[in-house]
């Protein structure tokens, strides 16, 4: 099963399958590395934000301390406090009179959480698509390769096991390549999806804490 023979055969379809597999593998590993780095930094930053939020009784002081931290929880805390201040500054407006502070904060904090999580969704669709389609693309390459191998064998008239095993063995490499690309993509998708869920849980907990503290805030 020599890949060199596959490319030397000159079959454009089979060559295209292997080139596509190579590109999909490169995309997969680039996404895995970038997403893991981003997830690690987010968790590290979130841990620092949690410490500051616990150590400071004043929400204003806590938010000021976490302002320099690049983390989802920091962004959520800053935006939530800004929503509160905007509401207090415009209490005479029609919106403030029609919408209580409690409901206003719930709506705005939820919107903020959704925007923050969108930053961590990129690449997940690509990983899922690669994991789902790579085995079938590899299988297509195998079927195509076996079909042409049998045609060539029939035309040459050589029906020995050696004549059949070589070309068919080369075609089967496409299926192995599809699995080689798909398995890391599926494992990475599951791992990153779990990391994103943990991040969402952290945001939910922080949102609840911010909501309660802002409703009891006396000094904006």
Curated annotation (Swiss-Prot):
One of its GO terms (biological process) is protein import. Keywords: Cell inner membrane, Cell membrane, Membrane, Protein transport, Transmembrane, Transmembrane helix, Transport. It is found in: Cell inner membrane. Involved in the TonB-dependent energy-dependent transport of various receptor-bound substrates. Protects ExbD from proteolytic degradation and functionally stabilizes TonB. Belongs to the ExbB/TolQ family. This is Biopolymer transport protein ExbB. The chain crosses the membrane at residues 13-33, 126-146, 168-188.
């Amino acid at each position: 099963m020599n890949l060199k023979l596959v490319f030397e055969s000159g079959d454009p379809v089979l060559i295209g399958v292997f080139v596509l597999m190579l590109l999909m593998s490169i995309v997969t590993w680039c996404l895995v590395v970038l997403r893991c780095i981003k997830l690690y930094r987010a968790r590290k930053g979130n841990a620092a934000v949690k410490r500051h939020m616990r150590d400071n009784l004043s929400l204003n002081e806590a938010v000021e301390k976490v302002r320099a931290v690049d983390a989802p929880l920091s962004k959520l805390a800053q935006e939530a406090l800004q929503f509160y201040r905007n509401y207090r500054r415009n209490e005479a407006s029609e919106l403030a009179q029609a919408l209580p502070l409690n409901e206003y904060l719930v709506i705005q904090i939820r919107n903020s959480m959704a925007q923050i999580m969108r930053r961590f969704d990129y690449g997940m669709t690509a990983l899922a698509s690669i994991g789902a389609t790579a085995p079938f693309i590899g299988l297509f390459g195998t079927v195509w390769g076996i079909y042409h191998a049998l045609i060539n064998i029939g035309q040459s008239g050589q029906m020995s096991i050696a004549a059949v095993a070589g070309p068919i063995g080369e075609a089967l490499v496409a299926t192995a390549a599809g699995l080689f690309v798909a398995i890391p993509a599926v494992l990475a998708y599951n791992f990153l999806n779990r990391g994103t869920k943990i991040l969402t849980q952290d945001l939910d907990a922080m949102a609840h804490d911010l909501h309660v503290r802002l409703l009891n805030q006396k000094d904006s």
